[in-house]
Amino acid sequence: MTQWQPASPTLWQGRDDSAEAANALRLFQTVTRSPTFSPEMYREKIALLGFACDEGVKRNQGRPGAAGAPDALRRALANLASHHGHDRLVDLGNIIAQAPDLEGAQQALRDAVRRCQQADMRTFVLGGGHETAFGHGAGLLDAFPHARVGIINLDAHLDLRRADHATSGTPFRQLAQLCDEQQREFHYACFGVSRAANTQALWDEAQQRGVTIVEDVDCDTAQAPLAQVIDSVDKIYLTIDLDVLPAWEMPAVSAPAALGVPLATVMRLVDAVCRSGKLQAVDMVEFNPRFDDDGNAARVAARLGWQIAHGWR
């Protein structure tokens, strides 16, 4: 059975510089920690929600360990300096998947996201494998049945696989099917795609679905297609698979990228989405702390998360 738990207060610790000045603060001092899942108490804030699940990665024959990512990322975020926007973060705890019930975990995340969005919160989910995306995206679609919701995925993989069961490789096919069921258009764009990591069958599926694709080798000039995607929708769900980054910047994922898109380039794309005024939901997925012996990969992911919370308009 899937369960919710508040985040441990021991995760949010860091250096206390408040004796220097009243505004010499770090995230551990400005993040609100909620003892209960009560999004209605935090309207117009950003819900920080963990999805402790890697069952989809296991089903996709990947390297398990992403279930430990939400808490590892909180630790890495905690000691970063708090600037504009960071005091909007409210830690609403973790949804913890109980293997092998991936579908139950995705439904729990879907319900939690819908409830947050309907309470006028925006959602920032820390995965988990990329199976996170179906629960997160479905909750957003449920909350805004009449909006044109655009999905922007920064990822080496299209994740449109055909499979008998949900995996970390199927979330956008599942969301496409959900859009069909809800009789709405499927707006999906994937930036950073590695042609070497996606079969022709996946490429064909993307073409049939009208997916906007920008390959990893073309992301230096991705601002124009990104602007077109942003202009074409009402609300945006941004999902960042950390394997979009090069292996030398992000080795701690299930499938490290041989080429990837450098962090500085990814940050420019993310900033454009954050500044659009349309960003409603974001997640970072596939971080695997088992392969982060020195903590550097967690710091890379945390820096990206810090930038999102800071720049989110």
Curated annotation (Swiss-Prot):
Mn(2+) 1 binds at residues 130, 155, 159, 241. Its EC number is 3.5.3.8. Mn(2+) 2 binds at residues 155, 157, 241, 243. GO terms for molecular function: agmatinase activity; formimidoylglutamase activity; manganese ion binding. InterPro entries: HutG (IPR005923), Ureohydrolase (IPR006035), Ureohydrolase_dom_sf (IPR023696), Ureohydrolase_Mn_BS (IPR020855). It catalyses: N-formimidoyl-L-glutamate + H2O = formamide + L-glutamate. One of its GO terms (biological process) is L-histidine catabolic process to glutamate and formamide. It is an enzyme of class 3 (hydrolase). The keyword Metal-binding applies. Keywords: Histidine metabolism, Hydrolase, Manganese, Metal-binding. Its cofactor is Mn(2+). Binds 2 manganese ions per subunit. Pathway: Amino-acid degradation; L-histidine degradation into L-glutamate; L-glutamate from N-formimidoyl-L-glutamate (hydrolase route): step 1/1. Catalyzes the conversion of N-formimidoyl-L-glutamate to L-glutamate and formamide. Belongs to the arginase family. This is Formimidoylglutamase. It comes from Citrobacter koseri (strain ATCC BAA-895 / CDC 4225-83 / SGSC4696). The lineage of its organism: Bacteria, Pseudomonadati, Pseudomonadota, Gammaproteobacteria, Enterobacterales. The gene is hutG.
